[in-house]
């Protein structure tokens, strides 16, 4: 068994965020996903002779906003470079990227690490740089769409030329969990900004992980290995954990780690060697002669900074410190901007924050999951949820009735007050309506009444159940308990 505690992992992430612009980074070709192969291409995408790229201004705006949200220093001057390598999915045999003068450098992101049976903690992870580049095409392999065993491969260039932001972290990450949480916070941030949908299954957010291990925090860095092919946050965590253990085992058995690229095999839950890793000199970078330098004024940066929304970390702090929510509930609500906005509007309409949180994170999220809906598809208005919550507090309806009417409120988005009136679901909260039913029960169940009076006080629950059954759950529970106890103690 490996002595994991005597080793320290050193992890950095390269995160590729696909920007959701309508057209590609250097041409007007569409970025639509899921259409027939090679329908969103043009001479610029294919690199035909005589074509010239022109930077999409929205790409620059989205990239700067992402940089500012990640606390990066945005350069006043940057440029594009050609990254040269041969692969079938690269139509020009070079990729337009940024090398020595990236858009932004030296930022950071705080992430919350919550693990079962461990104390939660917050970690500040440095970000080396953010640069803009174009995406490559996609190889489609025959058979199972895997290279191994396929008879031929086809190339779909629909993705080629789509705008990417590559976000490179500093080697500040130490565990697979931290790596997964960092990637998750990146996705949360770009979704809040509206610059990307961050869909890992569609390739809108892709992460490559660089991992090495060393003997303690003061030892020099070991040889790093790059891991690819992780399409979920859980895969990132599992791939990191596996690779850390693999490298430690190699070292402890007297072996050597090579600088290589490995693929995560989800089915086998292990990493497999793909190729030796190239260095930057292998790409022969040089400035792209077809694209001029980019100048970004302080005034323009200030305009874009002022357009940033309240980001997830600030919302979490606000929910805990101002709204009194638990750290867990604050995390769940802030995970999606539509949920966060809905929750805040519900509170603004008079609902108590903790009650609003319970309804949003439990009942509403449960309904949406059961019906395979996203929060953006929710028809229920914050005003109507706040009204329903306050009806419970005023004893107009019970919590049980509220849960029963919630699906209809979500489907129709009608006033809870109106729905309760139409269905006759208002809580019975006057003694004169409840006492006759209690008297009926006492007359019908004399043996149970005598048993209660002889000390079997748990029978109170039996009578409460019978009362609720006859009132169809509409009797005020507190009043019902009080009146029943008085009668039974007779």
Curated annotation (Swiss-Prot):
GO molecular function: asparaginyl-tRNA synthase (glutamine-hydrolyzing) activity; ATP binding; glutaminyl-tRNA synthase (glutamine-hydrolyzing) activity
Catalysis: reaction(s): L-glutamyl-tRNA(Gln) + L-glutamine + ATP + H2O = L-glutaminyl-tRNA(Gln) + L-glutamate + ADP + phosphate + H(+); L-aspartyl-tRNA(Asn) + L-glutamine + ATP + H2O = L-asparaginyl-tRNA(Asn) + L-glutamate + ADP + phosphate + 2 H(+)
Highest taxon listed in the record's lineage: Bacteria
Single GO biological process annotation from the record: translation
Keywords, sorted A to Z: ATP-binding, Ligase, Nucleotide-binding, Protein biosynthesis
EC number(s) per entry: 6.3.5.-
Function: Allows the formation of correctly charged Asn-tRNA(Asn) or Gln-tRNA(Gln) through the transamidation of misacylated Asp-tRNA(Asn) or Glu-tRNA(Gln) in organisms which lack either or both of asparaginyl-tRNA or glutaminyl-tRNA synthetases. The reaction takes place in the presence of glutamine and ATP through an activated phospho-Asp-tRNA(Asn) or phospho-Glu-tRNA(Gln).
Subunit structure: Heterotrimer of A, B and C subunits.
NCBIfam families referenced in this protein's UniProt entry, alphabetically: gatB, PRK05477.1-2, PRK05477.1-4
Protein family: Belongs to the GatB/GatE family. GatB subfamily.
Protein name per the record: Aspartyl/glutamyl-tRNA(Asn/Gln) amidotransferase subunit B
Species for this entry: Prochlorococcus marinus (strain MIT 9312)
């Amino acid at each position: 068994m490996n002595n994991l505690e005597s080793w320290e992992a050193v992890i950095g992430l390269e995160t590729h965020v696909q920007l959701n612009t309508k057209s590609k980074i250097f041409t007007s070709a569409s970025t639509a996903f899921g259409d027939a192969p090679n329908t969103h291409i043009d001479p610029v995408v294919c690199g035909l002779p005589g074509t010239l790229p022109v930077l999409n201004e929205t790409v620059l705006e989205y990239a700067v906003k992402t940089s500012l949200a990640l606390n990066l220093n945005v350069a006043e001057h940057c440029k594009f470079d050609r990254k040269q390598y041969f692969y079938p999915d690269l139509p020009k045999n070079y990729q337009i990227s940024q090398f020595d003068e990236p858009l932004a450098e030296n930022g950071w992101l705080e992430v919350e690490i919550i693990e079962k049976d461990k104390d939660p903690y917050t970690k500040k992870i440095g970000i080396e740089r953010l640069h803009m580049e174009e995406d490559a095409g996609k190889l489609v392999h025959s058979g199972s769409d895997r290279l191994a065993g396929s008879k031929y491969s086809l190339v779909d260039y629909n993705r080629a030329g789509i705008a990417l932001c590559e976000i490179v972290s500093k080697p500040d990450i130490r565990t697979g969990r931290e790596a997964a949480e960092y990637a998750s916070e990146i996705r949360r941030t770009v979704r809040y900004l509206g610059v990307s949908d961050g869909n890992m299954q569609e390739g809108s957010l892709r992460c490559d992980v660089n991992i090495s291990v060393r003997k303690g925090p003061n030892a020099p860095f070991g040889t790093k290995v790059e891991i690819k092919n992780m399409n979920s946050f859980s895969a990132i965590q599992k791939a990191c954990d596996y690779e850390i253990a693999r490298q430690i085992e190699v070292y402890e058995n007297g072996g050597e780690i090579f600088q290589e690229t490995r693929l995560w095999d989800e089915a086998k839950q292990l990493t497999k060697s793909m190729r030796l890793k190239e260095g930057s000199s292998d790409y022969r970078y040089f400035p792209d002669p077809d694209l001029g330098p980019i100048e970004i004024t302080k005034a323009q940066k200030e305009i874009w900074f002022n357009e940033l929304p309240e980001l997830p970390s600030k919302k979490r702090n606000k929910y805990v410190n101002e709204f009194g929510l638990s750290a867990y509930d604050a995390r769940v609500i802030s995970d999606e901007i539509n949920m966060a906005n809905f929750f805040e509007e519900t509170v603004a309409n008079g609902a108590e924050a903790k009650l609003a949180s319970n309804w949003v994170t439990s009942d509403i999220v449960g309904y949406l999951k059961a019906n395979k809906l996203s929060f953006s598809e929710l028809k229920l208005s914050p005003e109507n949820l706040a009204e329903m919550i306050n009806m419970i507090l005023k004893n107009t309806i019970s919590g049980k009735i509220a849960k029963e009417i919630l699906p209809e409120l979500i489907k129709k988005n009608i006033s809870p007050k109106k729905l309760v009136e139409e269905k006759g679901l208002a809580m019975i909260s006057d003694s004169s309506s409840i006492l006759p039913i209690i008297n009926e029960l006492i007359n019908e169940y004399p043996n149970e009444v005598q048993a209660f009076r002889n000390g079997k006080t748990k029978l109170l629950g039996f009578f409460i159940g019978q009362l609720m059954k006859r009132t169809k759950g509409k009797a005020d529970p507190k009043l019902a308990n009080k009146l029943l106890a008085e009668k039974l103690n007779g």
